[in-house]
């Protein structure tokens, strides 16, 4: 009896598990627990028979003085724990590294010329893994020095072949931060741990079943292969799981209303769905939505990574629609063209929410009335999950912007509040509607309405910050959102602001508006804690990331890009991290 192997865990495997758990804790969802638990179960169930065989045939052994004693199928409990902790650690590293990536946009329909290329890549991988299995089988048949290598390849090869065949598209298309990095980082770490363990004799490989080659001094080539293969299995398993989830949640025409914790059978159905059935327009819409958010709002782009998958997709599509609608109006050559765009969008919404019109009519109107670059944003709007009134109010907000052509429209703080409710409060309301769609709550209708109203107020607060930030930019396009009665009290006219938006009196009014923003924010922020738990942290990040702009404006220590105050990326990341860990 001894504690050498247990000490390996205490020193080298448990500390990374604690660190990774702490780092990922703010993001953990029920789905993540399900994914990790599912893979741990498979890892243990598939490894025990193989490892037991290695021990019973003398290929692998553990001196009695290094283990505590209890065994399962001849395997020391420390080794069984190793199966669990390795799978857990590698899975959490994968989850952390892949979190910023919106994976559904990496799905591919494999149509046209790309189809043959994808098939060749799939076949190349299959041939590679089949060759490894065949070589492993040959090593086992011949016995001797290649036995351990052969057993590794024959055991791991079929799993890798299966996972590759199911998820090769994701494995090849996703960034290396989602694929290679979560394989090689833990592999390199375990190579170092294994080197120390083999030198101390914590576990021993029989000399007649190994080649005697070393990757470096103290690390047997077979052990290096084992850790590379097992970490590849874990990451391939996570990728296959996420591939299935992406298919389930991206294509409602294939899977209507999938569960947030889908069964293994449903996951397999998703993986076996032919790529030719994927909807090109859906993937394009999501891809354009991600790029729009990345270009137009770095704060919300960072916050979007904290939202769970299906909700994240709908929020991206909602933002994309709002952004496109706003740009159509703002970029119009004159007021008549802008009014025409609003009329077309109103017609679009009437068609979408009409019970009598078929989808083909909606599609035709979009193709006839809107530029190709904007069509996917309209086609993919998650209208069935939203009530029509906030969208109609958003159009009223655009109409208020057009009224600037005739002169100032924001005469009092009440006018500014109404405007902000229409252009920002409405968006916040729709975000909350999407949250309650994906994560039903036990709250009654009245309580939900209170939360929606608070969301509307929070949208107003964010819009106040936006206006305070963009005083100079807005002046360049002939708009002043500061109330006229404020300007009068400060001894300024509307034209004074248009001509010189950086004068000292305006800086004072900016701070005054920010005070209003933070006052509204303080009254509304507690309602966030009544949202479903899956959305609380992400919504806090979205709000705090934007309110940080207000804090920087208050401090007057900010960078200016294109006439706007910006928050450095490092500070945005720190705000997001602090917010996620605050409650």
Swiss-Prot record:
Coiled coil: none annotated. It is a multi-pass membrane protein. It holds the Pfam family SQS_PSY. The keyword Isomerase applies. Gene3D superfamilies: Farnesyl Diphosphate Synthase (1.10.600.10). GO terms for biological process: carotenoid biosynthetic process. Residues 250-583 are annotated as: Phytoene synthase. Pathway: Carotenoid biosynthesis; beta-carotene biosynthesis; Carotenoid biosynthesis; phytoene biosynthesis; all-trans-phytoene from geranylgeranyl diphosphate: step 1/1. Its main location: membrane. Keywords: Carotenoid biosynthesis, Isomerase, Membrane, Multifunctional enzyme, Transferase, Transmembrane, Transmembrane helix. Its EC number is 5.5.1.19, 2.5.1.32. The chain crosses the membrane at residues 3-23, 35-55, 75-97, 120-140, 151-171, 173-193, 221-241. GO terms for cellular component: membrane. Bifunctional enzyme that catalyzes the reactions from geranylgeranyl diphosphate to phytoene (phytoene synthase) and lycopene to beta-carotene via the intermediate gamma-carotene (lycopene cyclase). In the N-terminal section; belongs to the lycopene beta-cyclase family. This is Bifunctional lycopene cyclase/phytoene synthase.
